[in-house]
Amino acid sequence: MVEQAGEPAYRAQQILDAVYRQKVESAEQISTLPQQFRQELEGQGVSVGWPRIENKFVSEDGTVRYLIAFADGQSVETVWMPEGDGGEAGDGSEAGDSAEGNRARNWDRATICVSSQVGCAVDCQFCLTALLGIERNLTAGEMVGQVCAVLKDQKVSPPEDRINLVFMGMGEPFLNYDNFMKAVRLLVKYVGIAEPRMTVSTAGIVPRIHDFGLEPTRPKLAISLNASNDELRSRLMPLNRKWNLEKLLAAARDFPLRPRERITFEYVLLREVNDGAEHATEVVELLRGIRAKLNLIALNPGPGIGFATPADERVVIFQKIVRKAGVPAFVRRPRGRDIYAACGQLKRTVEILPAMESQRL
């Protein structure tokens, strides 16, 4: 854009600085640009600034689900979780037993869950986002824009405020890899969120796991496991037919970890489907030889999903079996389940069902 206008390359840096650091909302507000260039940008309809918050829903636990709209009318969801979703890492590890609502500023850290695509093509059978199908990839600017819009609405500013990011919203980040990595670099350089405070979750795009391990600047890696054998995983996650557990776990074993770093494996527990003691034992064998930790997620319910949430005692037994084998295992507490903001519930739901009613702004 800058080159096409015949402007020097450093103008691009001025625009990025104005958008992400000065938080301008139009080209006319970028005082470092020549007036003529600003007018040209305005005349061409160039969108400068952040996406628009179209709607937001507030949970009883303080979680906020944002419906964020882009210039072409498409929208995604972004989730704000005061106190994160458990643990300093912001990835659900070391989750506590309960979380109080955080309407006031009484939190030490927060986590933002970011979307990478409009919809999702991976088609996990227990995820509401899969029901949307896939519309398009998000640009790097749209991913960063989600974060900036939420930070502005919450009146926080990293690095002064401790903000974690998880790329675990709508979409598969590794199917939009180049834009995702560009967004990471922009977030580090201009927004002030260091990559160790970011985690990306993949359903198992094996070639991109290899690529990701070679990145000089990268977030932490989480892998969505969800089954203890290929037959079950192929039924729950059709992607497994292309990259099965053998290929996926080989990529995990080869992944270059930093000191004290572990790969997080996420496991959504479905009642009497993958939540038995035999499944826990199989998971232990799968993770043998990998510096890993396991996040257990009891299914978050939603219409159109043909699975049920497991009983609490089955979750506890599963966790005990894995921990006894020496694998750190944590139960991620649900955040925003009442407003369809929890893991697997993002489907741009506007009308909240009576059983899941909460405050709407």
Question: Positions of the model-derived regions?
Answer:
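Auxiliary Fe-S-binding modules of radical SAM enzymes
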Residues: M1-N102, R253-E261, Y267-L361
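Short secondary-structure boundary/capping segments
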Residues: K56, N102-A104, S157, Y190
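Canonical Radical SAM [4Fe-4S] cluster-binding loop centered on the CxxxCxxC motif
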Residues: G84-S98, A104-L151
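Short beta-strand motif preference
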Residues: Y66, T78, I112-V114, I223
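Short linear Ser/Thr-Pro motifs
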Residues: S59, S115-S116, S201, S224
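Conserved AdoMet/S-adenosylmethionine-binding subsite of the radical SAM
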Residues: V150-F330
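Exposed loop/turn and edge beta-strand positions of beta-sandwich/beta-sheet ligand-binding modules
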Residues: G62, A110, D161-N164
